Amino acid sequence: MEILDKQAFFETREKLYTLSRSLNIIKQRIQIAENDRKKCLITINELESLSSETKTYKAVGKMFVISPMTSLKTELKQQVQKDEEDVKGLINQSKYIDAQITDTERSLNELVRKK
């Protein structure tokens, strides 16, 4: 019985470690998406302060291609929406993993109390 308890303890501890790593990765992805969204919003604000006749360029790989300001704004707004959706999805994932971590910690505490 003791061997099974040790094995269950180590498996639960490993699961807790894996879940914690997953949660940290998701938090990093949330931060990256939020930073990208902020950059897009700043760029949109800067573009709106320019006159409509100003030539604008879009980065394509290592080169820049002339692009109408309206299409740049549209692409940036779409990117902002995509980033917001990504953040919402990632927040849901983090809540789910957080609940799993809580459950796993509870199981780990029960195993420790058993001994």
UniProtKB/Swiss-Prot annotation:
InterPro entries: PFD_beta-like (IPR002777), Prefoldin (IPR009053). GO terms for molecular function: protein folding chaperone; unfolded protein binding. GO terms for biological process: protein folding. Heterohexamer of two PFD-alpha type and four PFD-beta type subunits. Coiled coil: none annotated. The lineage of its organism: Eukaryota, Amoebozoa, Evosea, Eumycetozoa, Dictyostelia. PANTHER family: PREFOLDIN SUBUNIT 1 (PTHR20903:SF0), PREFOLDIN SUBUNIT 1-RELATED (PTHR20903). Signal peptide: none annotated. It comes from the Eukaryota. The keyword Chaperone applies. The keyword Transport does not apply. Belongs to the prefoldin subunit beta family. This is Probable prefoldin subunit 1. Gene3D superfamilies: 1.10.287.370. GO terms for cellular component: cytoplasm; prefoldin complex. Binds specifically to cytosolic chaperonin (c-CPN) and transfers target proteins to it. Binds to nascent polypeptide chain and promotes folding in an environment in which there are many competing pathways for nonnative proteins. It comes from Dictyostelium discoideum. Keywords: Chaperone.
